Amino acid sequence: MFQDNPLLAQLKQQLHSQTPRAEGVVKATEKGFGFLEVDAQKSYFIPPPQMKKVMHGDRIVAVIHTEKERESAEPEALIEPFLTRFVGKIQGKNDRLTIVPDHPMLKDAIPCRAARGVQHEFKEGDWAVAEMRRHPLKGDRSFYADLTQYITFADDHFAPWWVTLARHNLEKEAPNGVATEMLDEGLERQDLTALNFVTIDSASTEDMDDALYAEELADGRLQLTVAIADPTAWIAEGSKLDNAAKIRAFTNYLPGFNIPMLPRELSDDLCSLRANEVRPTLTCRMIIAADGSIDDDIAFFAATIESKAKLAYDNVSDWLENSGTWQPDNEGIAQQIRLLHRICLSRGEWRHHHALVFKDRPDYRFVLGEKGEVLDIVAEPRRIANRIVEESMIAANLCAARVLRDKLGFGIYNVHTGFDPANADALAALLKTHGLHVDAEEVLTLEGFCKLRRELDAQPSGFLDSRIRRFQSFAEISTEPGPHFGLGLEAYATWTSPIRKYGDMINHRLLKAVIKGETIARPREDITQQMAERRRLNRMAERDVGDWLYARFLNDKAGTDTRFAAEIIDVSRGGMRVRLVDNGAVAFIPASFLHAVRDELVCSQENGTIQIKGETVYKVTDVIDVTIAEVRMDTRSIIARPAA
């Protein structure tokens, strides 16, 4: 008699609308209960029985109950699940399989089965890709997942690579395809095969995409010719190879190996500027004035060159520093190194005064054995030969940025606008507390930004620099010319790595249109979005593989007295993160390892400091000695403690 009663339905509706609700993100704990985080200030307790309906990271709506003045949340509706597609490890066997997601906050096994069409017979320890199919807040009894892809077996030494690539849905190998003959592009190529072009790279590099040639002019000015590998001479726009490169967007460099953007026949052979091989190039010739500036008379043209020497960074650096035994093959090569060195110093000096120069940070290289085991991690400082190539590439990219801007009005530009305008006042206030006075308006201009950066570089430590980093905007890829504040340049468009960057291939096609005097369409915006997304995924993949290898490398140091110098890179409520100076590993030091009495300890992310009894004991950029307390292989995290 009540089922169709409109009064009862109205009463139910009223009760529902009057019940308090909140939307937020579920945060799990290791103790079974959780919290619904609504914003930075407000969170609600979720009791253990209710946590069984949700997963860490789910965005949900919950009913808020109040009992004895204590509020708790009862999950009611799912807005966005945390897990959709994920990787994990299989438990169980035969028809009773579960999968544990590979995530530090997700420990519960999810019942699963192989999806239709997946032939592999899964067993305990296998790595797999899964997709969530059921969720309790969607009216299902429990969580359930389909296994959509087998990755590898439990003890595969190369699991860090295969699992990471599968997690980010990235390619595992080079694209298929071969370019049989060069295209007829209607370009006249200058024959520069007689000139002493050289390449300078790591000794192991196969995909050499830049060769350099310098000469001194009669008036004492230096002329630099930068020849760049020419994959667009082989790959037609819109072809199968071009579309594959467009999707990949970049060569993916992971510790130990790379997954190229182009087929290896092209990247490591046909296009690579190998010594004593004739190769087509896109070439830029510029004149460096006495003060290091680049003359307006910039020439882009197609050419053929023959590199006369494959030089290695360390050999060239040793020779210039008068150390080591290596010698150039002949006086012609020696003369090139000397001239390129002069250009490097001249351009470096100009950038120091008129743009910005990055501080040199070492690169860390993993030395791997046959089975992917980490034999060593070597810090490779950026030496003078690295800087020769860097200065030449920056100069060439600056030339391309100018030419594309002036002749076409578009291109693929790297744009960085410095500080977010919304943060300008807060930035000025922070700097003022440290005795630096800046105008909030001026610091948003390229000149004002450069001026501040130079003042920060002159500080005795990098502490203040680290504090203002959060106010900076991110670099973007844009078809519109714009300044690059980070480099201190009015515009920056890369074209010097077309074997490994699709954006550089696009700029090659645009520059060729300029050379031929043809009109060409502006690149589509969705291409820049794809490049930005791929760059993000590749960086995450590199970091994930690195974390795994660092955990393997330092595992046997856990619990020992081995000391490592470590730079504090971040402070949070729970402790601080440090980077080991010798190998680049990042470790976490919990607050409990810093001081036993929690009430006497203040960890301030805002200030980048840790105070004990009101006194600053640690701050970001400090270098301290640490030991490794624990390595958690399941989460690839390293826990350190200050050395006694």
UniProtKB/Swiss-Prot annotation:
Keywords: Cytoplasm, Exonuclease, Hydrolase, Nuclease, RNA-binding. The keyword Ion transport does not apply. One of its GO terms (cellular component) is cytosol. It is found in: Cytoplasm. It comes from the Bacteria. Gene3D superfamilies: 2.40.50.640, Nucleic acid-binding proteins. NCBIfam families: 3_prime_RNase, PRK05054.1, RNase_B. This is Exoribonuclease 2.
